[in-house]
């Protein structure tokens, strides 16, 4: 796990200019050619997975503050509790998604829960409209977690999304035996061209299945 490697071998990485590809290359010799390539952006995707026996929350807190720009150091996205949360909606739109939580007793069964509750488990059937609608749902929930606001997010909201604050809130929630179910890596769809994403929402609002917006 990257967090444990940083903790053990490069504990003060946030005080230096860490080349994440070079660091990974030193471990993953099998994929040396991949790390030798040039990239315009680097995305790191973690699962929160509070039930995992190898927890490094302090290091991850530092990582999420350090890896905050995809075209420079790299950008870290954390899914709560794991990747499958991107499709943990019972319908599209799903206005109840804002309030969905996962409780401690269900952490180990999350994949099964998603499989039983998702509106569609077959990602091969997802189209552009589906992915945009999902990204908007998750962004709306992240805004709710961060600011306790229940409204449609704007591009300015996206620009001021504080992943470190969201992680801290989720970490505190964990002490109360729950976390909010939300996916952040799906926001890569927005991160690539934020203005284009929000322009599409504005111009073609009724084409998407969006929460918390009155559609004509």
Regions found by a protein language model. Name each.
Residues 2-15, 21-216:
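C-terminal accessory helical subdomains adjacent to catalytic cores in phosphodiester-
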């Amino acid at each position: 796990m990257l967090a444990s490697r940083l903790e053990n071998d490069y504990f003060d990485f946030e005080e230096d200019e860490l080349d994440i590809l070079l660091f990974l290359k030193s471990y993953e010799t099998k994929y040396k050619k991949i790390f030798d390539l040039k990239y315009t952006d680097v995305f790191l995707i973690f699962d929160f997975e509070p039930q995992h026996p190898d927890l490094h929350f302090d290091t991850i807190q530092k990582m999420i503050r350090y890896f905050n720009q995809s075209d420079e150091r790299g950008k870290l996205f954390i899914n709560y509790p794991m990747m499958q949360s991107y499709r943990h909606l019972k319908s599209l739109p799903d206005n109840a998604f804002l309030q969905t939580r996962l409780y401690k007793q269900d952490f180990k069964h999350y994949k099964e829960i998603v499989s039983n509750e998702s509106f569609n488990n077959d990602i091969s059937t997802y189209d552009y409209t589906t992915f945009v609608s999902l990204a908007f749902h998750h962004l709306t929930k992240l805004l709710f977690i961060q600011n306790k606001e229940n409204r449609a997010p704007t591009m300015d909201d996206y620009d001021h999304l504080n992943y470190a604050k969201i992680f801290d809130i989720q970490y505190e929630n964990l002490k109360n035996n729950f976390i909010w179910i939300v996916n952040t890596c799906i926001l890569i769809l927005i991160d690539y061209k934020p203005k284009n994403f929000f322009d599409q929402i504005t111009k073609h609002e009724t084409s998407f299945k969006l929460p918390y917006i009155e559609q004509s």
